[in-house]
UniProtKB/Swiss-Prot annotation:
It holds the Pfam family F-box. It comes from Arabidopsis thaliana (Mouse-ear cress). The lineage of its organism: Eukaryota, Viridiplantae, Streptophyta, Embryophyta, Tracheophyta. The keyword Nuclease does not apply. LRR repeats lie at residues 118-146, 171-196, 218-243, 249-274, 299-330, 331-356. Residues 7-60 form the F-box domain. Keywords: Leucine-rich repeat, Repeat. This is F-box/LRR-repeat protein At4g14103. PROSITE patterns: FBOX.
């Protein structure tokens, strides 16, 4: 084939199409096109998405060189783009990056009107986000994933367009007060994810957001329990909740809830007593105020842990008049004492799914299975 007459088809494309193509490339490759010609340098300046990850860019043997090279690379990328508008900025860095360099990067993208901001800062030195993050009028989507030391310390919060907030492994300087301040400054918030947030050390935890539609909270440890948890979310339709039973639930407003995934757990010392057969007739903790407020759901997923809670930490199982789909997780260490009452109180149930049938044998499974003699576990029902 004669290629002598071939031409650069991509370079001849209209600028808006070429820029759109660049937006699908990893930032490192997109930035490298700026050396091809003045045109490509101009086009890179208008790439709307930047994804910067120090683990995938440069890999010299010396760790210091990695950090320095990456920091210099970010400086060059932001300089190339100047003040052009930015849609999404994602920054993932580990320890070794100078925190002093990070703040100007964040301020740069905020000043350019970024709408999606994803910060994964796994630092081992003290670091506070610049206050401008909490006063950005253009943010619609904000994800904060921190390591050991970065914390959220807020005074004034005004995020008028923010609809999605994701916070993972993050410490609040003022504990529950800090979370309350943050949420109160998000008048349009619809999606909230709180993952690995140790609110058991707080005096109280409050999620009060009238506009919220979806909430996910996850805390996996069960050595401690939260003192007080308040959920005032009247328009919430989806809830995924993993936590140890709290000391109290002063207010739980879930009137619009349609789908719930619940993994409530007993405190570990109480769980040990339960497994050893102590106090099986005594209630441990009290999840009644929480459980009673999810009775409007149509779709419900219950973990094996939650079956324990229904048995030993709930005054009564509410009537689930709207429930049509129920999924129950099984575990060989957990009995089904609460299952008969749960099924009896679900008069409109259409679909029942058991994720595993192995469970701890007890005398109180009622007519839900064939557990007649208590053995270590029942293989099937």
């Amino acid at each position: 084939m004669d290629l002598s007459g071939s031409r650069d088809v991509i370079s001849s494309l209209p600028d808006d199409i070429s820029s759109h193509i660049l937006s699908f490339l990893p930032t490192k490759e997109a930035a490298s096109t700026s050396v091809l010609s003045k045109k490509w340098r101009y086009l890179f300046a208008f790439v709307p998405n930047l994804d910067l990850d120090d683990s995938v860019y440069l890999n010299p043997e010396n760790e210091t060189e990695i950090s320095t090279s990456f920091m210099d690379f970010v400086d060059r990328v932001l300089a190339l783009q100047g003040n052009s508008p930015l849609h999404k900025f994602s920054l993932k860095i580990g320890d070794g990056i100078d925190p002093v360099r990070i703040i100007p990067w964040i301020n740069n993208v905020l000043e350019r009107g970024v709408s999606d901001l994803d910060l994964h800062l796994n630092l081992e030195s003290e670091f506070l986000l610049p206050s401008q993050v909490y006063l950005c009028k253009t943010l619609v989507w904000l994800k904060l994933r921190f390591g050991l030391y970065p914390t959220i310390d807020v005074e004034d919060v005004h995020l008028p367009k923010l609809k999605t907030l994701y916070i993972e492994a993050t410490h609040f300087e003022e504990h529950g007060v800090g979370l309350t301040k943050l949420l109160s400054g998000c008048p349009m918030l619809e999606d909230l994810v709180l993952d690995d947030i140790s609110w058991f050390i707080w005096d109280f935890a409050s999620v009060s957001v009238p506009t919220l539609k979806r909430l996910r909270f996850s805390w996996q440890e069960r050595d401690e329990f939260p003192k007080s948890v308040l959920l005032d979310t009247p328009n919430l339709v989806y809830l995924k909740f993993t936590d140890t039973v709290a000391g109290k639930y002063p207010k739980v407003n879930l009137d619009s809830l349609v789908e719930a995934h619940i993994d409530l757990r007993l405190l570990k010392p109480l769980l040990i007593n339960y497994h050893q057969g102590y106090g099986e007739n005594d209630m441990v903790g009290n999840a009644t105020d929480f459980i009673m407020r999810i009775c409007n759901v149509k779709t419900l997923y219950l973990s094996a842990n939650t079956l324990q809670v229904l048995t030993y930490s709930c005054d009564a199982i509410p009537i689930f008049n709207n429930l049509t789909h129920l999924t129950i997780e099984s575990n060989p260490r957990v009995g089904w004492q609460s299952v008969p009452g749960l099924l009896k109180n679900s008069p409109n149930l259409e679909t029942l799914i058991f994720q595993g049938l192995i469970h701890k044998a007890t005398y109180r499974c009622g007519d839900v299975c064939l557990c007649k003699k208590p053995r270590k576990e029942i293989l099937s029902c």
